[in-house]
UniProtKB/Swiss-Prot annotation:
Pfam families: SnoaL_2
UniProt organism field: Mycobacterium bovis (strain ATCC BAA-935 / AF2122/97)
Protein's name in the database: Uncharacterized protein Mb0035
């Protein structure tokens, strides 16, 4: 897969998530995809397999009481099948608001996403929001 195709795959994945298109998300991920969500809150952990990763994304959206928006700001690629997606996440729940830049390091192989690792501009605010 070319670097442009990797970037397009990540853009397509974000668009599918924004639309709530689980079928498209499933097609973007390799069957053995892994997602790493840092922290100690209930949504943190390591999720393995496409069904678990898609469920994690759905659980995160549901935990934000339908208020979560993710706006993709930029995608950057190297020549080794890695893409960094920088985005803004906004959500509110239980009287708390989270509005911050976040990033995901995405690994692509064989035209599908094989690994996702999340990063937060303010890890403490993220932890407090999802607690």
């Amino acid at each position: 897969m070319t670097d442009d195709a990797d970037l397009d795959l990540v853009r397509r994945t974000f668009a599918a998530f924004a639309r709530g298109d689980l079928a498209e998300l499933t097609q973007c991920f390799a069957p053995d995809v892994e997602q790493f969500v840092p922290g100690k809150h209930a949504l943190a952990g390591v999720f393995r397999g496409v069904d678990n990763v898609v469920a994690c994304l759905g659980d995160t959206a549901a935990a934000a009481d339908g208020t979560m928006t993710v706006t993709l700001e930029d995608v950057l690629s190297n020549t080794d099948g890695q893409v960094i997606a920088v985005y803004r996440l906004r959500a509110s729940r239980a009287g708390k608001v989270l509005d911050q830049r976040e990033a995901i390091l995405v690994t692509v192989a064989g035209g599908r996403i094989t690994r996702l690792s999340e990063f937060y501009a303010d890890p403490a605010a993220t932890e407090s929001f999802w607690a």
